Amino acid sequence: MKKILVVDDDAMNLKMACFILDQKSYPVITAMSGEECLEVLEREQVDLILLDVEMPGMNGIATLEKIRQHKEYSSIPVMFLTADATEDTVIAAGRLGADGYIKKPYMPQDFLEQVENVL
């Protein structure tokens, strides 16, 4: 089964994503910051990263940039999971190689479909 890393600074958003992914029995690891995401990637192999954009410290765009620069995990698919759907953010995400963009709030079925399309 594919392992998914969910990164969001909001505990309720993490719980919601984990609950939905659990319905399909996906193993999930969570992180609450960009820095913690990079720490998890040093010790865990994951098949997909769901990454919030607006986080304190290293935001999602900066985190994606670091992920893409790192040889060991640069090829892991990354989808943004965020309420920040500004045109600039979408353009920056695409330029850095984001594999998708899920806008919050989302419907559970739509969320799962988009995740499964990338996996």
Regions found by a protein language model. Give the residues of each.
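C-terminal output helix
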Residues: 106-116
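Alpha4 helix (beta4-alpha4-beta5 surface) of REC/receiver domains from two-component response regulators
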Residues: 18, 62, 85-102, 113
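Charged docking surfaces used in two-component/phosphorelay signaling
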Residues: 15-23
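Short hydrophobic/Thr-rich beta-strand motif most characteristic of the beta2 strand and flanking loop
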Residues: 25-32, 40
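Receiver (REC) domain active-site loop signature in two-component systems and cognate sites
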Residues: 55
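Acidic catalytic/metal-coordinating carboxylates
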Residues: 12, 32-36, 59-65
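Active-site beta3 strand of CheY-like receiver
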Residues: 44-50
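Active-site residues of response regulator receiver
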Residues: 8, 52, 82
